[in-house]
Amino acid sequence: NLSPEEIESFSVLKDATATAVYGVKGANGVILIQTKRGQIGKPRIQIKADYGFSAPTMLPEFVDGAKYMEVMNVASQFSSGKDMYTQAAINATRNGTDPDLYPNVNWLKAVTKDYVPSGRVSLDINGGSERLRYSLILAYYGEKGMTVTDPGVEYDASNKLSRYNIRTNLDMNLTPSTEINVSLGGYILNQRTPGYTTSSDENPRTPFTDIIKLAFKNTPIVHPVIYSNGQIPANTSQTNPWAAATHSGFISSYISSLQSVFAVTQDIGKLWHPLKLSLIHI
């Protein structure tokens, strides 16, 4: 949950190098991130703002209801020698004359948006002198999720994420050989997801994953998204993906984290060149 504006550089430790420093937790490698620190010079203030849109890059193409019925008829002919659906039902599904009785639904399109907006704003203040250098970064990132909403419902159950970051680094030279470093960083994360979920400790999943899974499983002719009289269809064997996305309430979570690092570095090169001793408290 770092903001990109906080990152100065990063490096990767692998194999024995990682395990020597971080033990078994570093067995798969460790990414070390160096955050931005103050540079000597006049105060520099930089403001950035980005706004864009996100969209799925690749989605599967599903057959429509009429084609599904024709394919099922072919399969039924092999197994029982009979058609599962009449030609009149297939024609009615293709023509869409009575969507309540002969639905033809692309469930993936019914529960997802074509694109969603996202935005990022940051404030970067950097500067300092030989004695004191400082860096302050404030950042905000927000994005809306891909699940649809129902305007007739009082609440908005679609995915949403908002994150606020703060990072400040101070470097102070008490003496020509003594340096104090203070780093403070954290974030507040607010995330909202649809309330429908089948997640468990043994099989953890996100609500979005569950809803997309429903959209993949449901047949295009099981029932319409919503009946023309406004009632929501229900089926004992197939959950309505649209209802799961829009009428199952929502889950809102707040996560906050604050990290601090205090270090004192003493240059004792006059006693043993070159050598520096550092005391770090995290």
Q: Where are these predicted regions, by residue range?
A:
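Short helix-terminating capping/connector loops at secondary-structure junctions
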Residues: 271-274
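Membrane-proximal, glycine/serine-rich, low-complexity loop/turn segments characteristic
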Residues: 1-5, 11, 17-254, 263, ...
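Short, solvent-exposed loop/turn segments enriched in Ser/Thr/Gly
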Residues: 257-259
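Conserved small/polar residues in nucleotide/adenosyl-binding loops
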Residues: 280-282
